[in-house]
């Protein structure tokens, strides 16, 4: 009886957490919808008097708004990618590992299993990176998110504002979302500013639109400052080919710690996120090279690194399609030892 109540309570808490995790997204959506109304109707259709100016403002605004909304949608609804089945322990290996009580034997078991996989990063103690919750050997740059309850390929962070884990599958979209958000706020601020001055000087009648125009400038400037800092930080990460987690915790390779282990040079670093074809760099469609399991590394020469030698490290003929759990609103990654 008591166990049933505990299970029901636990299920209810999980349900509440899932609902609450969408609150930050709802806040952003409501702010954006209000900004659309304030700019299109209160500014362009009511306050701006010149027909030509109205048309120019509306065309440019909607062009930016489409890409802003598109990238936000992709950041939210592009599911995080998990390691495929080759990195999961088989049922037999899982039972052997769980039943083995000697830590040194467990470590050796993981070492033997990892020899068959393209895994070059280690824990701080030099052990094979293993997730005891997902029961898999973690690919390079993969981390477990305790919020999403799964391992995420090339995990950057868990973002509450998109209610999703940002990783290999959607980092490009997230970066584009930041860029178009900055552009969106900057465009609103620059076009609204002259009318803000006119209202301030009393050159325009004090009507209902005054509140929307004045508050629109304030909100645009506030978001612009915070977003440009975040966008600048992620641009720096891309230029170094780092994730947020790698910036805080230096990756450890088989040869030892190396903070620039994935740094291939500025252009190649950008291509690792956006791909080789520049015409796709501004469009939110998947163009990041690779499969998220293996990455070129600066710390290895071409004879050691199959990706730099243009060779396939391993083949996967199995169907790896699956449903991934939904994320929730906090940042949580397992600690590695």
Swiss-Prot record:
Membrane-protein topology: Multi-pass membrane protein
EC number: 2.3.1.225, 2.3.1.-
Lineage, broadest ranks: Eukaryota, Metazoa, Chordata, Craniata, Vertebrata
Polar residues biased stretches: 327-337
Biased composition (Acidic residues): 312-321
Residue intervals on the Cytoplasmic side: 1-20, 78-172, 235-337
Tissue distribution: Expressed mainly in brain.
Ranges where the DHHC domain occurs: 129-179
Gene Ontology CC annotation, any one: postsynaptic density
GO molecular function, a single term: zinc ion binding
Transmembrane segments annotated in the record for this chain: 21-41, 57-77, 173-193, 211-234
Regulation: Inhibited by 2-bromopalmitate.
GO biological process: establishment of protein localization; peptidyl-L-cysteine S-palmitoylation; positive regulation of dendrite development; protein localization to membrane; protein palmitoylation; protein targeting to Golgi apparatus; regulation of dendritic spine morphogenesis; synaptic vesicle maturation
Active-site residues (renumbered): 159 (s-palmitoyl cysteine intermediate)
Designated name of the protein: Palmitoyltransferase ZDHHC15
């Amino acid at each position: 009886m008591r166990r049933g109540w505990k299970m029901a309570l636990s299920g209810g808490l999980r349900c509440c957490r899932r609902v609450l995790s969408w609150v930050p997204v709802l806040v952003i959506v409501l702010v954006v919808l209000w900004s659309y109304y304030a700019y299109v109707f209160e500014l362009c259709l009511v306050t701006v008097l010149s027909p030509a100016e109205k048309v120019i403002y509306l065309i440019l605004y909607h062009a930016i708004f489409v890409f802003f909304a598109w990238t936000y949608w992709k950041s939210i609804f592009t599911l995080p990618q998990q390691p495929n089945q080759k990195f999961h322990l088989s049922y037999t290996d899982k039972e052997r590992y769980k039943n083995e009580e000697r830590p040194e034997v467990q470590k050796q078991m993981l070492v033997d299993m990892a020899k068959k996989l393209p895994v070059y990063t280690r824990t701080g103690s030099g052990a094979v990176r293993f997730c005891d919750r997902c029961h898999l050997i973690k690919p390079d740059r993969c981390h477990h998110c305790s919020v999403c309850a799964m391992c995420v390929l090339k995990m950057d962070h868990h973002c509450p504002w998109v209610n999703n884990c940002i990783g290999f599958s959607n980092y490009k979209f997230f970066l584009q979302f930041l860029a178009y958000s900055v552009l969106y706020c900057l465009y609103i601020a620059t076009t609204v500013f002259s009318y803000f001055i006119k209202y301030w000087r009393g050159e325009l009648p004090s009507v209902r639109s005054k509140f929307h125009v004045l508050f629109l400038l304030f909100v645009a400037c506030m978001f612009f400052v915070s977003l440009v800092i975040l966008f600048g930080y992620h641009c720096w990460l891309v230029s170094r080919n780092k994730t947020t987690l790698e910036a805080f915790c230096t990756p450890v390779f088989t040869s030892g710690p190396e903070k620039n282990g994935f740094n291939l040079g500025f252009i190649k670093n950008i291509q690792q996120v956006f791909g080789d074809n520049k015409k796709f760099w501004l469009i939110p469609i998947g163009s990041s090279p690779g499969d998220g399991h293996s990455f070129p590394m600066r710390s290895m020469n071409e004879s050691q690194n199959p990706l730099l030698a243009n060779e396939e490290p391993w083949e996967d003929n199995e169907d790896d399609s699956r449903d991934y759990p939904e994320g929730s609103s906090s940042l949580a990654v397992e600690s590695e030892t």
